[in-house]
Regions:
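Hydrophobic alpha-helical segments
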Residues: 1-189
Length: 189
């Protein structure tokens, strides 16, 4: 399940039990991406706060646009865990006539994306693969696609969150599977 010791739900007490209750799934299970933080409940809380701020708080970017960034970054980083979770979440957010976009983007196919969406995924790609190569012209390209500076900030925040989450998952060995709740659902808090 992980490369380091984790504390399972039934052995959690105090701060950790409260964090598991707060951030766990409706069935009482806790996703492995969170359980890898179990030795440091403050780290789990910080991860969740960053996730909620980046992905669920009000933003001029839609939730689907932010999930597209997450799917793109996770695919580029080779993080199957986050790729599967967030492609499922994206699929739930898209209207019926665009549901296929989630699986296409998961495979790296951006043909179903709008110009605006492609500008977001292009920015996320460059920020993931070559962060020091991002220049004013990249920002100008996003502006020409109709994005304003707040949207660009939120795109950078979403891409940066996934860079962090992917490294936690990959670096600590969180795996999809046993103990996982339903994927792609929103947090309770």
């Amino acid at each position: 399940m992980a490369y380091i010791k984790i504390i399972p739900e039934d052995a959690a007490d105090g701060e950790l039990a409260e964090a598991y209750r707060r951030w766990g799934n409706p069935d009482g299970s806790v996703d492995n991406v969170l359980k890898v933080h179990s030795l440091n409940p403050a780290s789990l809380e910080a991860h969740c706060a960053l996730y909620v701020q980046s992905m669920h708080k009000p933003s001029p970017l839609s939730r689907a646009e932010r999930e597209m960034i997450g799917v793109t970054v996770s695919r580029l980083n080779g993080c199957d865990y986050c790729l599967h979770h967030h492609a499922a979440g994206l699929g739930r957010l898209l209207p019926d006539d665009r549901k296929a976009v989630a699986e296409q983007l998961k495979a790296g196919d951006e043909s179903g994306l709008s110009r605006r969406e492609r500008s977001l995924t292009a920015y996320a790609t460059k920020l993931t693969n070559e962060p020091s190569a991002v220049t004013q012209s990249d920002i100008d390209t996003m502006r020409h696609a109709g994005l304003d500076d707040r949207e660009i900030l939120d795109a950078a925040q979403a891409a940066a969150y996934f860079a962090y989450a992917n490294r936690i998952v990959l670096g600590l060995g969180a795996k999809l599977g046993e103990g996982e709740g339903p994927i792609g659902l929103i947090p309770k808090s």
